């Protein structure tokens, strides 16, 4: 750790000593907006002729050029669906000009109807459902992980079980796990979360992260319920290379790189990228179930390799044809908490090939096609063959089975679970004039599983895992209406769910096995509306009845510690959200945003992971009611200081009248649901400036974040002395400094500055104070 501190100090000294000429340089800062409603245009291109240099507008339409000499510059600003505009900008020595560039939307004739093109920023901000957008400016170059960024988002928490590579579950307004959709470029990844974690996506490749709360757009496909996270990747310049290396506490190392090339004359874009992560995760943890003794994690090594490529053609019959091969390889030791696990580990590999086809005016005028197909082969290997297990005092005990085993019930395992998956998502959008849009979405999932565990069969004396076939289809139809003056927007969606499964199952400790043949369907509907009271003030109201299909693991278990539960029913959620948004982004220097939302949810057939005396199982828990409120304010306090603050109160209560499958009154009715935080808050400040040490082409960011989670219960609050997960307050500090007009970045971060004790769900200890430093180079 001392070496890490010395490294950070050396980098800070390097930044201070790296100064160029002391001449007073000029700069340009501005925003690009739609000329009719002042909405910022995310991703608009700004090109300075004299510099032969360009930039892309950020999430608020902002852009900046620094370190300029006095003189006159020509800025060419363009955006898809808008007329290109040229601006002459004259700078005096030492002057930073602030400008607003308004682009006029193009119009396309569809017969007798005129359809005005809409930019991506307008589509996002004008949606009727609650959505938080995290821009590339909050991501690029920093030591932050995606988890760090999402944890600061109002209404969102990340439930981690340990350090780097530990299981991470996203929670939105208290709903978590497979209820929350995980998407990359609107492609569902929930079926592959055993192989691709939300933190695996190289953060420097991300343009923005969209967090949907409550109603999830049907165009995403799948059966997400209660919320979704969609990661949108960057669009790169014609020539681009990006490489970074980060070193963090607990012997953690991260390497990420991407290379892109655009051959415009042939309409071909290709690239490769990837990342490698290694960590020992050897932090000291405090075991609350053993009188708070402190032990160093000794079996939590983690390695992951992620490689990907892309070939995109823009001059074939389709507007865009893309092929993307991906490989993900993971190795993870299994760290013990209740006992000292020393040998068990997991290896997994995933091979994925994805194809995307896009075509505007497909077959008929006004009909846009977007179809993606992916084929995946995955191999998941759990090895647990230790002949004895240990307690935390170092005492050894023989395994239950002569074949070994130290996990769960301590029966040996050498599982090889292979799966072949095909996913297809079809999105058809038809524009009917300026005010009406119809969208049809179809999402097919085919999964054939081939598990094998000869060691387990020898250990327990029977076959426990079987081949399976699972098919599901979700169809969605959405009708959008937008008033002529753009004050009112309504989005009505209906969904149909169908799933089938064919396999066999056997109780872990019972005799015999049986056929499992499921064929079920369901229906959901939701509506969301938005009304502009003033150009800067809008109200949102949404309500929905959504359904989530049980996953394969929930239905079939894992043949080891999780028993089958093929009788599981789909979850059903009734939700209402009402909110207000006051937004001055791009209209006032403060870029002030104030948002408040109230929400209600009633979840039926809640699927819950429950541990028993022998093994565990997913069960339909019954009913749960949620009432909550969230609020956020963020603004540029000055031209060099940005601040934000948010708070979430989410009251999740057991709503069952009776114990499951009985007439016995439920003793926990009305009690708060355990293991779910109910009061959270975040706040932060960011100082940013140009050429703080003189010279030119340098930018500096220094930030501080504080997060608070109130104490909550480990189990239902039945007695005053029950175990609780304690209140936690953590502070993070960090910096980022860039050189040569954002070509070289050096950043550092201290997480959990005060070394506060932090426990996650089920009292799992999380890392204390840690350090990280990162260097990144961009060639464009």
Model regions and ranges:
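Membrane-embedded beta-barrel scaffold of Gram-negative outer-membrane proteins
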Residues: 532, 540-544, 570-627, 648, ...
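Gram-negative outer-membrane beta-barrel transporters
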Residues: 593, 598-602, 620-713
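Short, acidic, small-residue-rich periplasmic hinge/interaction motif at the N-terminus
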Residues: 33, 37, 44-49, 78-82, ...
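N-terminal periplasmic accessory domains that precede
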Residues: 97-102, 146-149, 166-171, 183, ...
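Short acidic/polar hinge/loop motifs at secondary-structure boundaries
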Residues: 66-67, 187-213
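Extracytoplasmic beta-strand/coil segments of soluble accessory domains associated
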Residues: 131, 147-188
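Periplasmic-side early beta-strands and strand-to-turn transitions of outer-membrane beta-barrels
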Residues: 238, 246, 263-344
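Face-selective signature of the C-terminal outer-membrane beta-barrel domain
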Residues: 314-329, 348-510, 514-526, 530-538, ...
């Amino acid at each position: 750790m001392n070496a890490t501190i010395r490294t950070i100090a050396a980098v800070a000294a390097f930044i201070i000593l790296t100064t160029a000429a002391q001449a007073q340089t000029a700069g340009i800062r501005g925003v690009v907006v739609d000329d009719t409603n002042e909405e910022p245009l995310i991703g608009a291109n700004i090109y300075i002729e004299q510099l032969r240099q360009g930039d892309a507008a950020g999430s608020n339409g902002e852009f900046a050029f620094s370190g300029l000499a006095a003189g006159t510059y020509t800025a060419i600003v363009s955006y898809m669906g808008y007329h290109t505009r040229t601006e002459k900008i004259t700078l005096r020595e030492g002057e930073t000009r602030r400008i607003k560039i308004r682009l006029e939307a193009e119009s396309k004739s569809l017969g007798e109807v005129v359809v005005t093109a809409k930019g991506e920023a307008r589509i996002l901000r004008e949606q009727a459902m609650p959505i938080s957008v995290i821009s590339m400016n909050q991501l690029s170059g920093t030591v932050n992980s995606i988890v760090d960024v999402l944890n600061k988002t109002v209404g969102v928490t990340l439930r981690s079980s340990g350090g780097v590579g530990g299981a991470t579950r996203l929670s939105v307004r208290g709903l978590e796990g497979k209820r929350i959709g995980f998407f990359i470029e609107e492609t569902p990844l929930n079926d592959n979360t055993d192989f691709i974690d939300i933190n695996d996506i190289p953060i420097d490749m991300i343009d923005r992260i969209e967090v949907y709360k409550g109603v999830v757009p049907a165009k995403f496909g799948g059966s997400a319920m209660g919320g979704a996270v969609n990661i949108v990747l960057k669009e790169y310049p014609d020539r681009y290379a990006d490489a970074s290396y980060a070193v963090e506490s607990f012997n953690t190392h991260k390497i990420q790189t991407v290379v892109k090339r655009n051959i415009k004359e042939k309409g071909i874009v290709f690239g490769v990228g990837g990342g490698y992560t290694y960590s020992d995760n050897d932090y000291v943890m405090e075991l609350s179930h053993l009188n708070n003794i402190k032990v160093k994690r000794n079996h939590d090594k983690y390695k992951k390799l992620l490689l990907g490529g892309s070939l995109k053609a823009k001059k074939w019959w389709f507007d865009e044809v893309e092929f993307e091969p991906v490989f993900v390889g993971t190795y993870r030791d299994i760290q013990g908490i209740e006992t000292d696990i020393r040998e068990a580990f997991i290896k997994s590999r995933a091979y994925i090939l994805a194809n995307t086809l896009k075509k505007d005016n497909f077959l008929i005028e006004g009909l846009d096609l977007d179809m993606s197909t992916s084929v995946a082969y995955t191999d998941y290997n759990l090895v647990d063959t230790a002949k004895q297990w240990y307690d935390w005092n170092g005492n050894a005990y023989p395994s239950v089975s002569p074949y070994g085993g130290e996990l769960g019930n301590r029966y040996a395992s050498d599982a090889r679970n292979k799966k072949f998956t095909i996913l297809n998502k079809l999105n058809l959008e038809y524009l009917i004039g300026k005010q009406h849009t119809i969208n049809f979405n179809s999402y097919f999932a085919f999964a054939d599983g081939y598990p094998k565990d000869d060691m387990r069969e020898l250990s327990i004396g029977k076959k426990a895992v079987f081949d399976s076939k699972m098919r599901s289809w979700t169809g969605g139809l959405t009708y959008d209406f937008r008033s002529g003056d753009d004050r009112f927007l309504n989005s009505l969606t209906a969904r149909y769910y169908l799933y089938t499964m064919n396999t066999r199952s056997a109780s872990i400790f019972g005799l015999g096995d049986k056929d499992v043949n499921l064929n079920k369907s369901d229906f959901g509907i939701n509506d969301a509306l938005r009304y502009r009271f003033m150009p800067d003030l809008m109200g949102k109201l949404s309500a929905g009845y959504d359904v989530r299909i049980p996953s394969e693991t929930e239905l079939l278990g894992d043949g080891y510690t999780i028993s089958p539960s093929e009788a599981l029913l789909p979850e059903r959620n009734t939700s209402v959200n009402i909110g207000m948004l006051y937004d001055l982004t791009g209209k006032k220097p403060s870029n002030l945003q104030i948002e408040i939302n109230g929400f209600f949810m009633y979840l039926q057939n809640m699927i819950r992971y429950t541990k028993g005396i022998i093994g565990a199982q997913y069960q339909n828990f019954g009913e749960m009611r949620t009432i909550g409120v969230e609020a956020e304010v963020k603004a540029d306090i000055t031209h060099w200081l940005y601040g934000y603050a948010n708070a979430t109160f989410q009251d999740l209560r057991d709503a069952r009248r009776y114990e499951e499958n009985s007439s016995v009154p439920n003793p926990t009715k009305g009690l708060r649901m355990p293991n779910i935080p109910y009061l959270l808050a975040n706040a932060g400040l960011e100082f940013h400036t140009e050429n703080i040490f003189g010279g030119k082409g340098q930018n500096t960011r220094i930030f501080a974040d504080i997060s608070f989670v109130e104490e909550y219960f480990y189990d239902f609050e039945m007695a005053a002395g029950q175990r609780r997960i304690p209140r936690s307050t953590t502070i993070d500090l960090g910096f980022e400094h860039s050189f040569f007009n954002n070509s070289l970045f050096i950043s550092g971060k201290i997480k959990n500055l005060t070394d506060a004790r932090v426990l996650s769900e089920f009292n799992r200890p999380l890392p204390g104070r840690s350090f990280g430093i990162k260097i990144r180079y961009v060639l464009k």
